[in-house]
Amino acid sequence: MNSIEFPLLDQIAQNSVISTTSNDLSNWSRLSSLWPLLYGTSCCFIEFASLIGSRFDFDRYGLVPRASPRQADLILTAGTVTMKMAPSLLRLYEQMPEPKYVIAMGACTITGGMFSTDSYSTVRGVDKLIPVDVYLPGCPPKPEAVIDAITKLRKKISREIYEDRIKSQPKNRCFTINHKFRVGRSIHTGNYDQALLYKYKSPSTSEIPPETFFKYKNAASSRELVN
């Protein structure tokens, strides 16, 4: 062992014995080797891209972005996920080797965001497709929040046991409520509902008799001349 990296090794730990388990050793080795697969579809990914620069320097956590899911053990979803993109995202997740983790970044990824109100093609939460380990809310989250999410994921990995990995597999997952669509009649028929129009119709000048309208108009004109 290199004594330069461990200067106190000869003085203190020369005859020491380190006892651990294979599970803890495996977790410790994976803490500094999280290789993320970047899945950015919207503006949240711009905030994550700033982490690559020298200001935040996310390389200190051992994060090495990979372009292939077969070389990654962390997928970071940032942005809106649509119905058409759902099969591709699920395929990328299935191609990642075990153990694998997911960070949902941004409101659009977690709940569908502002696009989930009237959109028929937006997935209302990426956890309906793949299991999520860390939720990172925000629109968009700051780079400091992304670092905090990675730190929390590292703490989760350090305490992980083999049974936890089994529970996260698709066959043992509890899915959330699926999308429920119903076909309704079209309201854009070009015809007005007369009953509804009469109910919410506000009074206008067209309902005032002509003689009354001109009477008040002449009175207002005379007062303006006096003033």
UniProtKB/Swiss-Prot annotation:
Family: Belongs to the complex I 20 kDa subunit family.
Residues making up the signal peptide according to the UniProt record: none
Keyword Membrane: yes
Lineage of producing organism: Eukaryota, Viridiplantae, Streptophyta, Embryophyta, Tracheophyta
GO cellular component: chloroplast thylakoid membrane; respiratory chain complex I
Localisation per UniProt entry: Plastid, Chloroplast thylakoid membrane
Domain of life: Eukaryota
One annotated GO biological process: photosynthesis, light reaction
Binding positions for [4Fe-4S] cluster per the UniProt entry: 43-44, 108, 139
Reactions mediated catalytically: a plastoquinone + NADH + (n+1) H(+)(in) = a plastoquinol + NAD(+) + n H(+)(out); a plastoquinone + NADPH + (n+1) H(+)(in) = a plastoquinol + NADP(+) + n H(+)(out)
GO molecular function: 4 iron, 4 sulfur cluster binding; iron ion binding; NADH dehydrogenase (ubiquinone) activity; quinone binding
Membrane topology listed for this record: Peripheral membrane protein
This protein's name: NAD(P)H-quinone oxidoreductase subunit K, chloroplastic
Predominant location: plastid
NCBIfam families to which the protein is assigned, alphabetical: nuoB_fam, PRK06411.1
Keywords recorded for this protein, A-Z: 4Fe-4S, Chloroplast, Iron, Iron-sulfur, Membrane, Metal-binding, NAD, NADP, Plastid, Plastoquinone, Quinone, Thylakoid, Translocase, Transport
Record note on quaternary structure: NDH is composed of at least 16 different subunits, 5 of which are encoded in the nucleus.
Job description of the protein: NDH shuttles electrons from NAD(P)H:plastoquinone, via FMN and iron-sulfur (Fe-S) centers, to quinones in the photosynthetic chain and possibly in a chloroplast respiratory chain. The immediate electron acceptor for the enzyme in this species is believed to be plastoquinone. Couples the redox reaction to proton translocation, and thus conserves the redox energy in a proton gradient.
Assigned EC number: 7.1.1.-
Names of the cofactor(s): [4Fe-4S] cluster
Record note on cofactor: Binds 1 [4Fe-4S] cluster.
Top enzyme category: translocase
